Structure formats: C-alpha cells, structure tokens
Amino acid sequence: MSSVNMWEIENTFFQQGYNVICGVDEAGRGPLAGPVCAAAVILPSNLEIPGLTDSKKLTDKKRRELFPVIKEHAIAYGIGLASEKEIDEINILQATFLAMQRALDQLSMKPDLALIDGNRETDFGVPVKTVVKGDSISANIAAASILVKVTRDDMMVAYANVYPQYGFEIHKGYGTKAHYAALTEHGASDIHRMTFLKKFYGTK
C-alpha cells in the first residue's frame, strides 16, 4: 500500500540500544461528545502487516480487518480513555495525555521507549520521542492508530443506542451540521463536552 519503510524509525532506535518500543496514538480530540481515547502497541520487531498505515488513510472495512490481526500479533497493547467530564475538568490536551498514560499502564510489559504521534509530550514514566505524522511512518504508531480508532468508533456507535437523537453512529461525535442541528433541537446529552459547546451556546 505504501513504499514507506514503516520500521525505519523503530530500527533507528533499536540501533541506539532500545529493545522494547511501543507506539502511542489517540482518537477523539476534536469531537463535541464522548471520550478521548488512546492506544499503546508493542509489535514484534520488523513484523510486516500488509496495509498497515495511518488509520485515517484506511477505510472502516480495512481498519476492521487489521484490528484483530494487530491484537493477535502484538506483544502487548493497551487502551486508555479520558471521559468527557475529565476533558471538561482538565482540558483536552491534559485529558489526551491522561488517556495515553492509561493506555501505557495497560501494557503487560514496560517499554524502553514510547513513540508518540504528534509534537507534544509529557512525563509518562518512560522515555518518550514524539514523531510528527508518526501514524504514517511508524509501524507501532500506525497499529495504535487503528486500534484506537476502531475502539472509539465502536464506543460512539454504542452511545448512539443510548442517545439516538444525535446521530453518533454517523459522525462519532464530531461537529457536523447534523450534529449541531440535533444540539439545537435536543440540547446537550450527558456525554457532550460542555467546554467544547461554550461558543455554540454563546451564539444562541
């Protein structure tokens, strides 16, 4: 699917003496509702998974094909989340870090190095390297991006059964025209991020 060597970054760090490297990615920073989620994945060194790349470049069908393959072959993986209430309390950046920490804490073994997608980092209790667009160039981050995207999408589909009036199964909580129309008609639900809706309600 891509000519990119998805193990180039990891191999650079393996050569520097790191032995256990995990990739970390998040999903759900931007939506108006639901949690922000993170995944941490440790794949066997240089494992080739055909089609592995940034989850955003894949169809939902392809992500769901890769989801069990990643879980089956991973040495370890963890999923963490921070709720909409925590997002409102501590802000989305800190909540994202909290979800990442919880994902790392779920790993059955401690990595020597965590590769984090993006350009912001905090103290996770393990050495960290940020990788801009890491989900497109790092196998471990790409695997994490797929696990976390499918996991969060499924959570929002489940929430759609509880709050059917918002269309969560379609937009997954993002601020689409239909979502804002539902907010206008029905008001906010228990899983909406009120800090994200201040501007919207300020215009009412």
Describe the predicted segments one by one.
Residues 1-204:
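RNase H-like, Mg2+-dependent phosphodiesterase core
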